[in-house]
Amino acid sequence: MKHLSRKCRSATPVARKAGKKIRPAVLWFTGLSGSGKSTIARKVVSKLKKLGADVEHLDGDTMRSIFPNTGFTKSARDEHIKRVGFLAGMLEKHGVFVVASFVSPYRESRDAVRSLCRTFIEVYVSTPVEECERRDAKGLYTKARRGKISNFTGISDPYEPPKHPELAIDTTGMTVAESTSLVMNYLMGKR
């Protein structure tokens, strides 16, 4: 498949075995605003629930509404991602499959989250900035290019792509169903 940039490195740790519950993990979607992270994550959550998983979705917009004073500087973003990562790790420890969708632009903070989790699966939604801008229903990229939004990832603030994600998906030209299938196939051990 041309949109899947790398094959999974090892057998998936979460596939359900003959009548047993899906093992908990932290499935961490990262990528630019408008890349498709949250949309795919919501579909994956739905599919995991249908398979009987105890699953929780942690999303960037939702979490920022809970922590409204979180800023967009590098240090504020790092602190926020580590806070969410701690929560994700605790949920996983208590048997919950966590699906997280955050821009999470810095490798160091994503690596810190990985260290807090038993099974961390990084999904890099690698959709190019040009496609993300084309999809931008909220007009955030336009505002960022006009200087009305500072520290906007991909425009005035960097995005550090993962070096070794478990899965990378460029959603350009893909349907949500196709993208979701790539993730579910990975999780269920189908290559």
Give residue spans per PLM region.
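Extreme N-terminal, non-catalytic leader segments
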Residues: M1-V26
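Hydrophobic anchor at the beta1->P-loop junction of P-loop NTPases
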Residues: F29
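The conserved Walker
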Residues: S33
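Conserved lysine of the Walker
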Residues: K37
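Conserved substrate/cofactor phosphate-moiety recognition/catalytic segment
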Residues: R42-G89, K93
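Conserved beta-strand scaffold positions in the cores of enzyme catalytic domains, especially
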Residues: H57, F120-E122, E166-A168
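ATP-dependent NMP and nucleoside kinases share a basic, alpha-helical "lid"
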Residues: I66, T70-G71, A88-R145, N151
